[in-house]
């Protein structure tokens, strides 16, 4: 895997800060509480994969949240443009990050193995 340029890393870092601000300005309370885990921009910065964390949302709620985010993408992009002073903003593609769920399941398995070894 190639290393990302410093400029691309800076863009991703800035988006990781600005997107939660943009989400907090929306009227939908489900979107206000979302956490941004990671932002991964394409090389040309035309697209950005935004990985979100909503630990207590059911799969149905997650589908609805993604639908609402697609509808609010223009507002989020406008906020990012005004907050950063950029002339263009990448198109956002929202996904839920399930790595924390996987890590929690692995921790539970390791804890169970530890208890079995002790007994």
From Swiss-Prot:
One Pfam assignment: RBFA
Matching Gene3D superfamilies: 3.30.300.20
PROSITE patterns in alphabetical order: RBFA (PS01319)
CC annotations in GO: cytoplasm
Residues spanning the signal sequence: none
Subcellular location: Cytoplasm
InterPro entries: KH_dom-like_a/b, RbfA, RbfA_dom_sf, Ribosome-bd_factorA_CS
Coiled-coil blocks: none
GO biological process, one term: maturation of SSU-rRNA
Keywords (A to Z) from UniProt: Cytoplasm, Ribosome biogenesis
Chief localization: cytoplasm
Assembly mode: Monomer. Binds 30S ribosomal subunits, but not 50S ribosomal subunits or 70S ribosomes.
UniProt similarity note: Belongs to the RbfA family.
Free-text function comment from the UniProt entry: One of several proteins that assist in the late maturation steps of the functional core of the 30S ribosomal subunit. Associates with free 30S ribosomal subunits (but not with 30S subunits that are part of 70S ribosomes or polysomes). Required for efficient processing of 16S rRNA. May interact with the 5'-terminal helix region of 16S rRNA.
Protein's name according to its UniProt entry: Ribosome-binding factor A
Record organism: Wolinella succinogenes (strain ATCC 29543 / DSM 1740 / CCUG 13145 / JCM 31913 / LMG 7466 / NCTC 11488 / FDC 602W) (Vibrio succinogenes)
């Amino acid at each position: 895997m190639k290393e990302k340029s410093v400029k691309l890393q800076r863009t991703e870092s800035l988006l990781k800060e600005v997107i939660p601000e943009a989400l907090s300005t929306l009227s939908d309370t489900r979107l206000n509480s979302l956490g941004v885990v990671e932002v991964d921009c394409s090389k040309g910065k035309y697209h950005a994969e935004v990985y979100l964390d909503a630990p207590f949302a059911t799969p149905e709620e997650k589908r609805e949240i993604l639908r609402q985010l697609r509808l609010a993408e223009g507002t989020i992009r406008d906020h990012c443009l005004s907050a950063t002073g950029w002339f263009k903003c990448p198109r956002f593609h929202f996904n839920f990050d399930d790595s924390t769920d996987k890590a929690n399941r692995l921790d539970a398995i390791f804890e169970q193995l530890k208890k079995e070894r002790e007994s």
